[in-house]
A protein has these predicted regions:
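ATP-dependent phospho-/nucleotidyl transfer catalytic cores
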Residues: 2-49
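Short, exposed beta-strand "edge-strand" segments with a Pro/Gly-rich flavor and a Y/T-containing core
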Residues: 14-20, 59, 144-150
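Active-site acidic catalytic loop and adjacent metal/ATP-binding pocket
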Residues: 44-82
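C-terminal catalytic region of ATP-dependent kinase domains
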Residues: 68-173
């Protein structure tokens, strides 16, 4: 069940047009009586947010994260719909080389975009903006949980062992 379909709020009838903010998500989860473990759900949501930042997922909106429903109760579902990560539309290797050799272009892809679908002050926010602001306690806690678990050597080995992509793609990822 997508997040958009679980709400018990006054915005539920307008959910297709509604753009959630970080505070909205926390409030909606806290108010929902059908969620079995609210604190765990909020923690897992922000774990997902940190991983989305790491993989550059620009499409995590209310219809592509959700819940499993049993006996009219909800538990957060395993993460799904990660197809919009690692710059999937960037296939031109000359452009990849340009980005890799240009610090300003690299910095844009670290600090400015991709952006999260979740709104901050009425606009999409960069992951860097949210994480570095330390504004959301739940996000800070997720960063503390997730960061030590990221082993860059394992990730580099995984990428290096993908036979179907070029060396340029491997370097870019």
């Amino acid at each position: 069940v997508p997040f958009n379909d679980v709400g018990e709020s006054t915005i539920e009838s307008n959910k297709e047009k509604y753009h959630y903010s970080y505070s909205d998500i926390i409030d909606l989860l806290n108010k929902n009586k059908k969620i079995t473990n609210i604190d765990e759900t909020i923690s897992i949501f922000f774990d997902m947010f940190i991983i989305d930042a790491f993989i550059g997922n620009f499409d995590r909106h209310g219809a592509n994260w959700g819940f499993l429903k049993r006996n009219n109760k909800y538990i957060i579902a395993p993460v799904f719909d990660n197809g919009s990560c690692l710059f999937p539309n960037l296939t031109n290797e000359d452009e990849m080389i340009f980005i890799l050799n240009n610090q300003d272009e690299l910095n844009k892809r670290i600090f400015k975009f991709p952006t999260s679908q979740i709104k901050l002050n009425g606009r999409k926010s960069s992951y860097f903006e949210i994480i570095s602001s330390l504004r959301y306690k739940e996000c800070n806690e997720a960063l503390t949980r997730i960061f030590p678990r990221i082993n860059m050597n394992d990730i580099f080995n995984l990428i290096d062992n993908i036979e179907l992509i070029s060396q340029i793609h491997k370097q870019f990822y």
